[in-house]
Structures are given as C-alpha cells and as structure tokens.
C-alpha cells in the first residue's frame, strides 16, 4: 500500500494508524507481529508521536530494521539506537524484541540477518531521502551492492559509508 498524506500536519498520526492497524491484524490471528522500521528524521518524528500513546506498541511484536549503518547501537547514527530512544526511551517493554543485524562485520551481518528475517512482514515502513535513497539503496550505487538474499551491504555517503539494507 502506498500512502500519500495530503496534509503535513497529519503525517505522523496517519502513519501511526497504519502501524497500529497492521500490528492489531497480525496479533488478532494469534501471532507475533513482524514490522520493519526505517531510519531518518521523518521516521523519528513518527516514532516520537507513537511513543505518546499509552498502549504503544503492544506485544508480541518483532521489530526489524529496513537498514542499519555500520556503527555501534549507542552511536547517534544508529537506526537501532534511534528507534529505541524515540519509541521506547531506550527500554524495550516485555514481549517486544528488536531483531537487528550485527554490523561489526557487514558481509556476515547481511547473511545472518537474511536468515533471521520472517518469510513475510505485516508492515514495512520506508521513507524516501531527499537524495532519492530508499532504505540504504542510493541512486547510482546499485552496481556496488554485495547482496545476500534479501539483504545487501551498501555504500552510502560519508560519514556512515558502510550499511546493511533490505533490498
């Protein structure tokens, strides 16, 4: 589903509604919901908005990342760290888990992360960067991908050049 939000002032609320609904539908079938979240300033605003809900997000829930920079999770450039800080104030509630790549060795991380991904997601959230990048797939860089199944090692602009990305 492609969602176009006509008014910027309703963007966060609209996206949070989609996230909540996808999780509810999966959990109504008695299963853990599987969602992939993205990084970036736009997404961070959505997660901060979502964190204001008293019942935000409900377990059982597995959160994956559409892409991650090859930096430690406590680094300001880490998408994992950004999601934890903005959505959960750094503390994951019981029954919610983050499944993220170990980016210390990007090529191994891509293979290992691909094996940990579910066969299907209940929702994948992506935004488009001002330079046209999607996840960590950058225009003009597709020939340099080192792919392992559904995950690739990519090269982005400095300062975070190494990345692991869904494809």
Model-derived features: where do they sit?
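Ligand-binding beta-strand-loop-alpha-helix segment within the catalytic cores
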Residues: 58-125
């Amino acid at each position: 589903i492609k969602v176009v939000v006509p008014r910027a002032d309703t963007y966060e609320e609209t996206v949070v509604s989609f996230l909540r609904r996808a999780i509810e539908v999966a959990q109504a079938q008695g299963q853990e919901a599987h969602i992939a979240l993205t990084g970036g300033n736009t997404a961070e605003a959505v997660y901060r908005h979502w964190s204001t809900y008293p019942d935000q997000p409900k377990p059982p829930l597995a959160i994956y990342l559409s892409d991650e920079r090859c930096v430690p999770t406590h680094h300001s450039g880490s998408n994992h760290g950004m999601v934890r800080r903005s959505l959960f104030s750094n503390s994951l509630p019981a029954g919610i888990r983050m499944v993220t790549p170990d980016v210390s060795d990007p090529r191994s991380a891509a293979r290992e992360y691909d094996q940990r991904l579910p066969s299907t997601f209940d929702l994948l959230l992506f935004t488009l960067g001002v330079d046209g990048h999607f996840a960590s797939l950058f225009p003009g860089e597709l020939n340099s991908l080192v792919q392992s199944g559904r995950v690739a090692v990519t090269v982005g602009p400095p300062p975070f050049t190494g990345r692991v990305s869904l494809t």
